[in-house]
Amino acid sequence: MPAPHRLYPRSLICLAQALLVWALLAWAPAQASQELTLVGKAAVPDVEIALDGDDWRWLARKRVLTLGVYAPDIPPFDVTYDERYEGLTADYMAIIAHNLGVQAKVLRYPTREQAVGALESGQIDLIGTVNGIEGRLQSLRLSVPYAADHPVLVMPIGARRAPPADLAGQRLAVDANYLPRETLQQAYPQATLHYFPSSEQALAAVAYGQADVFIGDALTTSHLVSQSYFNDVRVVAPAQIVTGGESFGVRADNTRLLRVVNAVLEAIPASERRSLIYRWGLGSSISLDFARPAYSAREQQWMANHPVVKVAVLNLFAPFTLFRTDEQFGGISAAVLQLLQLRTGLDFQIIGVDTVEELIAKLRSGEADMAGALFVNAARESVLSFSRPYVRNGMVIVTRQDPAAPADADHLDGRTIAMVRNSAAIPLLQQRYPQAKVVTADNPTEAMLLVADGQADAVVQTQISASYYVNRYFAGKLRIASALDLPPAEIALATARGQTELISILNKALYSISNDELASIVSRWRGSDGDPRTWYAYRNEIYLLIGLGLLSALLFLSWIVYLRRQIRQRKRAERALNDQLEFMRVLIDGTPNPIYVRDKEGRMLLCNDAYLDTFGVTADAVLGKTIPEANVVGDPALAREMHEFLLTRMAAEREPRFEDRDVTLHGRTRHVYQWTVPYGDSLGELKGIIGGWIDITERAELLRELHDAKESADAANRAKTTFLATMSHEIRTPMNAIIGMLELALLRPADQEPDRQSIQVAYDSARSLLELIGDILDIAKIEAGKFDLAPVRTALRALPEGAIRLFDGLARQKGIELVLKTDIVGVDDVLIDPLRMKQVLSNLVGNAIKFTTEGQVVLTVTARPDGEAAHVQFSVSDTGCGISEADQRQLFKPFSQVGGSAEAGPAPGTGLGLSISRRLVELMGGTLVMRSAPGVGTTVSVDLRLTMIEKSAQATPPAAAAQATPSKPQVSLRVLVVDDHKPNLMLLRQQLDYLGQRVVAADSGEAALALWHEHAFDVVITDCNMPGINGYELARRIRAAEAAPGYGRTRCILFGFTASAQMDEAQRCRAAGMDDCLFKPIGVDALRQRLNEAAARAALPTPPSPQAAAPATHDATPAAFSAESILALTQNDEALIRQLLEEVIRTNRADVDQLQKLHQQADWPKVSDMAHRLAGGARVVDAKAMIDTALALEKKAQGQAGPSPEIDGLVRTLAAQSAALETQLRAWLEQRPHQGQP
């Protein structure tokens, strides 16, 4: 082991080397630094700080605080010139040094890193202009912030839209000394970062197109923009980064210095902080306040739905709105819109217009959402909604610089005054100076040109506009002569009526803008010729103020020592008082309902935040003022009334009072529960009143809505009762006749001849009941929107002739002349639903005959061509009793009737005919109008515009065509019939055989496709729902084969055939490639008609009409099926009937067995398909109960996932119905004569 004394020289050498390295490191920054003279605010304020004795002794020993700054400058925080250091940081450093009783020393370093190294080595005590992010990265301890640091985004003033929130694809320019790269990359990972040596260079890069977006702190950005780039860039949005504000940084171990610096900073009053901000021209910066107002949920939703708002502005309304030579929008309104953009996040798209009329038209048409600047007047308020005015300016008189020009307002009578067209001041001016002549111009420039050219003596304009135009365009020619005694003009934003959310958003945003900001914007555009003086112009004054401040500090130094002794005692009392006041403030402001306190003269002494929020005002606007003076209600008359009520209340009563009141605030009526409590002093003398209210508008509206809902429910119940009573009466009346007459007929002896008159009465009553039910169904269909017309080619003359023939006999019975008059020129056939048109005419003619006892009923038809259409009018006139106007208003309501003549008594019928007729005419696109007078008669006119159809030379009337149709076909079609249900297949085949067609049948889609490939068919009729290849797939495959290259056949006609009567079934068939859809069951005549239509479309031979069917047998029909349907389908062919029914019975029995097996296997899709098959079989014999059960089972089984008791019951019911149907069908067949019997 080496001797200890040999280690000493080596240890000393190492120690000496370490000291040398430390000295070199400390010497290097010291040599690089430059000492500057601190130039702070001239009048440095004294603040009360609480430090203990150790801190003051430490400061006495310290004597000097060294502040480190670095290049480049960060204005307005750091500004250096001529070895002087000033700026916002310098001002705060001067306050700290002054109040701590130490000297301030400033050392400037070339870089931030050198300044931080000097701080770590102890060469300086603190470093300025450090935000929270920088402090954390550099391991510094930061003081409380002395200035806000809101990062903001800046774009060129010509940018149309705000950048995307994540700045994706944007070139982001940033000061290298502002935010670390890691922070920016985390906030904007998709942006491209470009670092610059200073904020000014980074901002210039955006101004001149080298970068897209600049990010910097709000104060520095606002200072640079206002000083150098006001016309080039604008702040568009706050950045999504929180920095914590600008602070002083000290070493992490220097806690004492941090404590004393914080003590001074925290003691600086808010007024002094504002004064320092104003000192550097930042008091009205648009970048200092980014707090958004509290928007409601509906307002936030509106802004989310309308991110871009179109703003209409006048092209020349300087200095409010103007477009510079580079087409950039500017002016006072442009600056206000920038403020609103920051507070709303909306993107304003500017639309320039030339006149106020054009601007208002765009607002009302929706081409623009709002106006950027518009004078407020009563006429415009009737069509527009105005925001809070952001400029109020008096009116002035501008005249020529001529002794003969009017000197003031008293000399305007008899003079010619130029004004902007539609100016709000024109009626006021004409009222005040009736002898003056007013001429108008399109804009202020033209109005002033009229004065400059001698065409007018004076122009009346706002002071701001007048100053702007005179200074810039008419200097030396025009002058502002005097102010005008008219109400000040108000400039505001405007929207169309109904834009409730938008105008509320704008008002909230405007209220969040301080008056200082608005005043600064206005002053910037007032048109002053000279630039405001800078710091250099005030250097001597500032030095003088600093000297006076130091002298004042010496004079008050003696007072400070004395006051310190009292401060400690006072602070204890103040703290207790402040605690009590804070408790009272929280108690009052925390109450959600408005509360106020007024003295006995009605002046406001105290109010809570809820009161201010209700009226949207600040405390300064109401404190110390009466209700009329503050006028928060917006109506001076209402304000005076409320003030007088309050004074009367205090004078008359001393007891608390609680009452409900309706009050109108800013045009809105609110229902409130108001309370007032007079209060006095300890001697009982009245001092004022405490009051407040609870807004119960929503509760009152809910009660009103509940009452309205009850009234609506009662009305609906009464209507239901009336309807049921009417229906009961209308149904029971014919039923009484039917039952009574049939009962009498049954009571007659069997060998006696039947009473034909009784049977006729029963028959007529049954027809009346059938018409009633039909009318009710028509009304229900029309009201449900499910009533479809079926327009076809119709001979116009045939419609009225049919109505005349129908009612001719009834008219003869009543001795009434029934006349048809036609005036049809150039119109033959039209496109109309003949059945429904005949229904309308029958109702009108029948009503006319019903209410006419003598005279005549005239049906007049007039038709004239109108382009490609025809204007047709049907008019029914009678000489009956007539109808009063009151009764006419009721006639077109369902079940409404009016009496006939006094002798005739009540009118027969249901009261549905006219209601149905009017609705049918409206569905046809026409109108039905009634004109009538009591004792004169009634005329009902139907006006229609119908499509004309050219009449073919070979056209044959329908009746003649029917007669000319041969009984046997000359040429038949080749028809492929596909159905997996054998009764349906057999029936359709027999029907087509009867029509003379050549039929090939297939019981599956696969078999049909094979037959279609082997043979050529003209028509294919396929069931839609089949196992395997269903009808839709079969149609698609046939159409695909026809579309293939080399297909040599003629395209066949494809019909779907289905028992599903859903409204969209025909659409599904056409979508699959079919030509049309047929619905089961279908009669022979209907089948022939559809084949005729298909043959005509495809140019196929037209199938002939069948021979007339044999008369139907009138055997009694069992309840489970319809014998009439069977007879109609089979044309009363006995052999076909028996063959059809045997096949139905056999197939139903097999389908029921298969259904039960599938039900046991829980194969629900196949259960649904089998139910559909059973429904199709039931439709053949019109077994309604079985059809309903099968359809219900089909619907229930679709999508079923597990066992269902309801399906179990439906399967059992369907099986029982099938068995009952088989029994009844066999019994019915036994009753019929066999073929060959007589």
From Swiss-Prot:
Residues annotated as domain Histidine kinase: 726-948
GO MF terms, alphabetically ordered: ATP binding; histidine phosphotransfer kinase activity; phosphorelay sensor kinase activity
Segments forming domain PAS: 580-651
Any Gene Ontology CC annotation: plasma membrane
Keyword Membrane: yes
UniProt keyword list: ATP-binding, Cell inner membrane, Cell membrane, Kinase, Membrane, Nucleotide-binding, Phosphoprotein, Signal, Transferase, Transmembrane, Transmembrane helix, Two-component regulatory system, Virulence
BP terms from Gene Ontology: regulation of DNA-templated transcription
Domain Response regulatory: 974-1095
Positions carrying Phosphohistidine: 729, 1172
Record topology, Cytoplasmic segments: 33-307, 564-1238
Transmembrane segment boundaries: 308-331, 542-563
UniProt PTM comment: Activation requires a sequential transfer of a phosphate group from a His in the primary transmitter domain, to an Asp in the receiver domain and to a His in the secondary transmitter domain.
Record-annotated PAC domain positions: 652-708
Gene3D superfamilies membership: 1.10.287.130, 3.40.50.2300, Histidine kinase-like ATPase, C-terminal domain, HPT domain, PAS domain, Periplasmic binding protein-like II
InterPro entries linked to this entry: BvgS-like_periplasmic1 (IPR049870), BvgS-like_periplasmic2 (IPR049871), CheY-like_superfamily (IPR011006), HATPase_C_sf (IPR036890), His_kinase_dom (IPR005467), HisK_dim/P_dom (IPR003661), HisK_dim/P_sf (IPR036097), HPT_dom_sf (IPR036641)
Residues covered by the HPt domain: 1133-1228
Localization per record: Cell inner membrane
Catalytic activity: ATP + protein L-histidine = ADP + protein N-phospho-L-histidine
Modified residues annotated as 4-aspartylphosphate in this record: 1023
EC annotation from Swiss-Prot or TrEMBL: 2.7.13.3
Protein name: Virulence sensor protein BvgS
Annotated source species: Bordetella parapertussis (strain 12822 / ATCC BAA-587 / NCTC 13253)
